[in-house]
Amino acid sequence: MDDTQHFCLRWNNYQSSITSAFENLRDDEAFVDVTLACEGRSIKAHRVVLSACSPYFRELLKSTPCKHPVILLQDVNFMDLHALVEFIYHGEVNVHQKSLQSFLKTAEVLRVSGLTQQQAEDTHSHLAQIQNLANSGGRTPLNTHTQSLPHPHHGSLHDDGGSSTLFSRQGAGSPPPTAVPSLPSHINNQLLKRMAMMHRSSAAAAAEETSHAFKRLRGSDNSLPLSGAVGSGSNNNSPDLPPLHARSASPQQTPADFSTIKHHNNNNTPPLKEEKRNGPTGNGNSGNGNGNGNGASNGNGISISDKLGSLTPSPLARAGADDVKSEPMDMVCSNNNANANDEHSNDSTGEHDANRSSSGDGGKGSLSSGNDEEIGDGLASHHAAPQFIMSPAENKMFHAAAFNFPNIDPSALLGLNTQLQQSGDLAVSPQGGSTGSLLSGVIVPGGSGGTPSNSSSNNNNNNSNNQQQKVEQQSSPHQLLQQQHHSTPHTNSPQLKQEQPKSGGGSCKSSDLHIAAGSERSLSRSSQGMPDAGGHSATPSPTAAYHKRERERERERERERERERERSLDHERDLERPGGTGSPPPPPPSHHSHFGQHPLSLLPSHHQLHATHHELSAAAAHHAHAHAHAAHAHALARAGSPMEHHHLLHHRRASLSPSGAVSSASGAGGRGGGAGGPGGPGGSLLSSVRAQDVAQANRLLLPLPLNACHRCDVCGKLLSTKLTLKRHKEQQHLQPLNNAVCNLCHKVFRTLNSLNNHKSIYHRRQKNHHSYFHHGAGVSQAGSPGSRLHQSLSSLSAAAAAANNSVNVGGGSVGGAGGNAVAAAAAAAAAAAELLLSPIVGAAAVAGGTASSTLQLAAAHQQQQQQSSPGIVKPCMDFL
């Protein structure tokens, strides 16, 4: 072997493999270093690929020092941008007819190679240069180098791996081969059709020579492996194709192809499609030969039997390819095969389109646009090529191997128009010609500044957020009911069942408040303003289980209400019977359930006032009093929570006053003692029931805190925590006698300054009233027989009893009855005025229910006096 001999090693599928590698890296988001964003979505790509295919991106990215810039494009449709990126990585793309104009406009703005007018003009100029070169050198040898291929009968030099082919090249001193002045007719017709589709020239012979010379310049090193290596020239897994017939004995070579297409063919070629992919590609060989000798497939899964017409039996001289570099001819024209359904390109088949279109979370976004009808059309129509490249009659650039949109919910496209406006605020148009400005890694082409936006991480979530907002707006009434339902814990304990309070013969039904036996949950539920528990919900429940639970709770409420009605009726019948004291005390009637209805500061201190609607004897009054104690004891036993137990205990302590017991005992023989004294029926009525309530009210029992669970062993006061109990004992009971003590409220202070401040704030204007009501005749407790208020109320009771006695006797003088009535009315007016004029007593009375008791006392007294002397009592009551 001569020392001057060299060997050329060729990777047959080099271009397709490189483009496939770039696409695989993009699919895996490996080494991506730029993000294109528009309409709130983003696509990740490689800067080197974008720069190689677009001068616009090359200039923009060259001036950007950022490691991973984000380019925001305004007035660019995301579907067009996605199709452009697919075109850059594949070399071809399918575009819907409705989107073709906007796609070409976007490609022209971004100056994508192969799709712009400037690119077509450059291609025409290069072809003209090639034509002139071919005309000048077509009859002479183009190069002194020769390319020798072994005869088919002498075996193959192709290696077993199929990745390279061995060629021998002689030195410059070897004799030149004979010139080849012409080409076979079938290759000439093939190339003539290509040239005619590009520039529609009538010079067929010149086009043949030009295209053939162009092929020789770029493809002189291409060769076809011999028949001995069957199917070894391809590195893909394309489906099996019919074997070819025997080839000619002379060396064969394929015409070169210059497309920069990426084909999914290196290990995962899917089944071929039925449609021809004439796009911006040629025959798909990527300038590297067919890749097999007898073969299964070429570089992109195209059958070799369809390409027999493009093979030449004669050897070609090597051209000066190093001196001439042309733009790819097949970027703008097709091979125009007669059989339009035999050429297949597997780079955008259904499976891969499905993978790419569903990779919205992978950084490239999903193939979707604001026009839903574009997706629904199926993308089945053919598309015309731009007029500046070729006419629609000659070729259709974008055939309808449709994009696949698997499982795209139309609701996912909600809010897209709002995203257009949002993304429009982030960037300016790239048509301004500026290379862009860098703001924290965000490039805003054509503008001086913009808002930094993490488009690569945040923009993909806008559709789902807008959709969720709309769904929440539509279902807000239903969710409101569901929140109100789930905010309150449900339980089956009887203490939480709603009840309707009854007082006497009337019912106190409230539509805004639930009555739930004084629990925290009932208070929180009533504060929410939910509808009455007795009625059904107007809004449908979310699940069947919820309906079932509601029905069960409704049945429980009905049964509870029935039981309460029976108890209340039995209780009223027991009260009407004068001697019915032998039966055990029933459970508490429904009127006790209004502990939970009223606020804690307005708990009424009279719970047996309905007994006054009946005619009470001494035994009946005593029975009512005993029944009240039994009811309280039963309620304490049934109290389910510490709060309920505490308030029931507080209520029982308020009801057990010594003045009530004394007045009940003093009125025991009132009706049997005859007329003329306080022991008569009127005195029995007022002293046994009303005086008890007045005495309870005058004790000024303020409501206890909710969490009071620690009792002082000295004064019996309930405190919330051990620390407050300790401080209470230290300040109230363990201080020395000479410390500062308030003489009005008996509160102990640590310093005299604190005592003076306390008096100036709380007792400056209330001293006289406080001492008048609460400190009389050496007795300091309000409600005791020595206090002024108790004396006034006692005189009121005595006057009322005397008036009632005079009316019942009937033989007394009218003047005496009138005088007693006037005296009773005056006493009532004075007592009420004194009570209301005192700030401390008045406020405490309102807080503890005293005002209600006083007004009821005055109303009962007015009704009684109007029966005896209505003309005299009415002016006094008007004064009140």
UniProtKB/Swiss-Prot annotation:
Residue ranges of the TM segments: none
Keyword DNA-binding found: yes
Alphabetized InterPro entries for the sequence: BTB/POZ_dom, Dros_DevTransReg, SKP1/BTB/POZ_sf, Znf_C2H2_sf, Znf_C2H2_type
SUPFAM superfamilies recorded: beta-beta-alpha zinc fingers, POZ domain
Keywords: Developmental protein, DNA-binding, Metal-binding, Nucleus, Repeat, Zinc, Zinc-finger
Chain intervals with Basic and acidic residues compositional bias: 341-355, 547-577
BTB domain sequence ranges: 32-97
Gene Ontology MF annotations: DNA-binding transcription repressor activity; RNA polymerase II transcription regulatory region sequence-specific DNA binding; zinc ion binding
GO cellular component annotations of the record: neuronal cell body; nucleus; polytene chromosome
Compositional bias ranges of the Low complexity kind: 227-238, 453-466, 473-491, 655-666
Claim: Zinc-finger is one of the keywords in the record: yes
Biased composition (Basic residues): 622-632
Induction: Induced as a primary response to 20-hydroxyecdysone in third instar larval imaginal disks.
Single GO BP term: male genitalia morphogenesis
Gene3D superfamilies: Classic Zinc Finger, Potassium Channel Kv1.1, Chain A
Major place of residence: nucleus
Function statement: Broad-complex proteins are required for puffing and transcription of salivary gland late genes during metamorphosis.
PANTHER family per record: BROAD-COMPLEX CORE PROTEIN ISOFORM 6 (PTHR23110:SF99), BTB DOMAIN TRANSCRIPTION FACTOR (PTHR23110)
Name of the protein in question: Broad-complex core protein isoform 6
